[in-house]
A protein has these predicted regions:
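Terminal connector regions
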Residues: 163-166, 299-330
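C-terminal substrate/ligand-recognition segments
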Residues: 371, 387-398
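C-terminal structured domain segments across diverse proteins
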Residues: 377-387
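Disordered, low-complexity segments in secreted/periplasmic proteins that are enriched in proline
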Residues: 315-316, 372-378
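A cross-kingdom feature strongest in bacterial/archaeal respiratory oxidoreductases
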Residues: 347-351, 384-386, 393
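N-terminal secretory signal peptides and thylakoid transit peptides that target proteins
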Residues: 1-17
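Residue-level detector of secondary-structure transition/capping positions
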Residues: 17-18, 23
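Histidine-centered copper-binding motifs that mark active-site loops
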Residues: 23-292, 298, 327-343, 356-371
Length: 398
């Protein structure tokens, strides 16, 4: 049997009656969750990577269909939403200067659209227009030009139609976009970890959000990695792996730890660091991405998400926020040790704007109010006005 680290044992043993520990990987989940897990078929399997579609000759042609789908989560059939029937959707890998061509079909029962989160691209024409409507049963074409000077990095795609985006992402509509570095020469093992959360009723349907969750954001009962519960990430002692991590949760902050081991951070979102920076914790807000190097330590470790206060004001007794650590994945390292050659990365190409001249100073007042005590839902305003997609409040020159 592989050794379990002291920190792992403390996590698995210290949660008491409020959590269930199942399987060698240490899956933790709330007893309040009505979705019954059948462990042998679902959790503890090796991490599965999404299918990857790579560009060729400067073009990536891909067809994406958003539709209801039945997937196995924790050994049970779950009725979710998915791109091309997979959770997450296929990974789209492009290079600077490429054109991303997407033939998109909406087979949902609601309006949707597509947003390439993090890409430095235009919203004009058939590109990344978040105000575009693709109604149920309709199809659309996207033509997205990746700038020739686009920095490499990890991004993602998801719906962005106002009023349905959070619900559709929560139900499973998300996938990764990689902008590859044309100068990269390393041969590291790469892992993509798209982390999401979901709540499922006993029927296997996605549970509807409560009033409190709609106001303050909901955190799912189950935390998934590439659509799996507590998968196993394998490696050999001394091996360095590059992990690309996406926080595809709609509200959950991810404060990630790996049994006290260090991460070497390469960059957040599109901001690549000049040199790797050591960190014992990674904090990712919803939509954030991070690229890290992980040196495999022999034995079993647990990648854990520590509860984080995201400012829910203690309303409703804090029911919208998780209060227990969650074992996101197990890292299992065995076999012969390997020596990884030193890895070099190109310097960051991002502009440092901290000393740039300020052309104009603007003051925007963000506020919220209302709620159930006021007889309605929470109202969010900027300069006293609620969001209106047909109104332009600020014009900013590029």
């Amino acid at each position: 049997m592989e050794p379990v680290t002291r920190r792992t044992a403390l996590i698995l043993g210290g949660l008491g009656a409020t959590a269930v520990v199942a399987g060698a990987g240490g899956l933790l989940w709330s007893q309040l969750n009505p979705f019954e897990l059948r462990m042998p078929d679902g959790s503890g399997a090796d991490l599965r990577e999404p299918d990857v579609h790579r560009s060729a000759a400067g073009v990536l042609d891909v067809a994406l269909t958003a539709a209801a789908s039945t997937k196995t989560i924790g050994g049970r059939a779950a009725r979710v939403l998915a791109y091309n029937g997979t959770l997450p959707g296929p990974t789209l890998a492009v290079r600077p200067g490429d054109e991303l061509r997407i033939e998109f079909a909406n087979q949902l029962s609601a309006t949707t659209n597509l947003h390439t989160h993090g890409l430095h691209v235009s919203p004009d024409g058939e590109s990344d227009n978040v105000f575009r409507r693709i109604d149920a049963g309709e199809s659309a074409r996207y033509r997205i030009q990746i700038p020739a000077d686009h920095p490499p990095g990890t991004h993602w795609y998801h719906p962005h139609h106002h009023g349905t985006a959070a619900e559709q992402v929560f139900a499973g509509l998300y996938g990764a976009i990689l902008v590859d570095d044309p100068e990269a020469r390393d041969s590291l093992t790469e892992r993509l970890l798209v982390i999401s959360d979901i709540s499922l009723a006993g029927s296997g349907d996605v549970r509807s959000a409560s009033v409190a969750e709609r106001m303050l954001g909901r955190e799912g009962d189950l935390v998934l990695v590439n659509g799996q519960l507590a998968p196993v990430i394998r490696g050999r002692p001394g091996e360095q792996q590059r992990w690309r991590i996406v926080n595809a949760c709609t509200s959950r902050y991810l404060d990630l730890r790996l049994d006290g081991q260090r991460f070497d951070v390469l960059g957040y979102d599109s901001a690549r660091l000049e040199r790797p920076r050591e960190a014992e914790a990674l904090l990712l807000l919803p939509g954030n991405r991070v690229d890290v190097l992980v040196t495999m330590a022999e034995g079993r470790s647990v990648l854990t998400a520590i509860p984080t206060d995201r400012g829910s004001f203690g309303m409703m007794g804090g029911v919208t926020r998780s209060t227990e650590p969650v074992a996101v994945a197990t890292v299992a390292v065995d076999g012969d040790a390997v020596d990884t050659p030193p890895v070099t990365f190109a310097a960051s190409t991002a502009r440092d704007l901290r000393r740039a001249a300020v052309a104009r100073t603007r003051t925007l007042v963000l506020a919220m109010g209302g709620g159930m005590m006021g007889g309605g839902m929470m109202a969010f305003t900027i300069d006293g006005a609620s969001f209106d997609p047909d109104r332009i409040d600020q014009d900013v020159a590029l």
